[in-house]
Regions:
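Rossmann-like S-adenosyl-L-methionine
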Residues: 1-192
C-alpha cells in the first residue's frame, strides 16, 4: 500500500511490524480472518460495522474497509484527516468524522460490531472508557504504544467495571534496540 502522510501526521515508521500489527488487528476483529483469506474470499465483506478510533491517516480504516460493510473513522487532527481522505478516496464504505473520540464515540456505540482504538501514549480518556462500559461493543482491538496506560485502561474495562474479557495481548517490537513496544490487546464483551 502507498499512503500519503504529511509531516505533522503520525505513521508507524517500522513498516514490516506495522504490517504484522495490521494482521493482528484484523484477526482480533474477525475470528475467521485466516480462513477467509485461505478460502480466497478476501474481497467478501461481512455485515459488520466497525469504528477506527484515533484513525490518523486512515491505515486501519483502509484495511477494515475491505472486510466490513461499514467503517467509521474518527480523528481530530485536521492534517491527518486530509491525509485520510486522500488515502481512503477509493473506498465507498468509510465515513470520516472529525472530532475527539470522547465526543464522537458516545453517539455511535449502539450500532457497533467492532472497535479499533489506537490512542496516543496517554491512553484513553476516562469518558471513552465510560462509554465502552455503558455501551459495550462485541469486540475491541486496543493498540497501545505504552504498556502502562494499556494496563491501566484494561484494569478499568476488565476488572473495575468488568464489561470485557481480555482475550489476548501481543507485544510488537516496533523500535528494535529501544525500550519502546506496541501492544495489541483483544477484548470481548461479557454478556450480562
Amino acid at each position: 500500500e502507498t499512503f500519503r502522510i504529511r509531516p505533522s501526521s503520525f505513521f508507524q515508521t517500522n513498516t514490516a511490524q506495522a504490517e504484522n500489527m495490521a494482521h493482528m488487528v484484523l484477526r482480533g476483529l474477525f475470528d475467521d480472518f485466516d480462513n477467509h483469506i485461505a478460502a480466497g474470499s478476501i474481497s467478501e465483506r461481512r455485515p459488520f460495522t466497525v469504528v477506527d478510533a484515533y484513525c490518523g491517516v486512515g491505515t486501519f480504516a483502509l484495511l477494515l474497509s475491505r472486510h466490513a460493510t461499514k467503517v467509521i473513522a474518527i480523528e481530530e487532527s485536521a492534517s491527518a484527516i486530509k491525509d485520510a481522505r486522500w488515502n481512503l478516496r477509493e473506498t465507498e464504505n468509510v465515513e470520516i468524522l472529525k472530532g475527539k473520540v470522547e465526543d464522537v464515540l458516545p453517539s455511535l456505540t449502539t450500532r457497533l460490531d467492532g472497535l479499533v482504538i489506537d490512542p496516543p501514549r496517554a491512553g484513553c480518556q476516562k469518558s471513552v472508557l465510560d462509554t465502552l462500559i455503558q455501551h459495550p461493543v462485541s469486540r475491541v482491538v486496543y493498540v497501545s504504544c505504552d504498556p502502562s496506560t494499556l494496563a491501566r485502561d484494561l484494569d478499568i474495562l476488565c476488572h473495575q467495571h468488568p464489561a470485557y474479557r481480555l482475550h489476548s495481548v501481543q507485544p510488537l517490537d516496533m523500535f528494535p534496540h529501544t525500550a519502546h513496544i506496541e501492544c495489541v490487546a483483544i477484548l470481548e464483551h461479557i454478556e450480562q
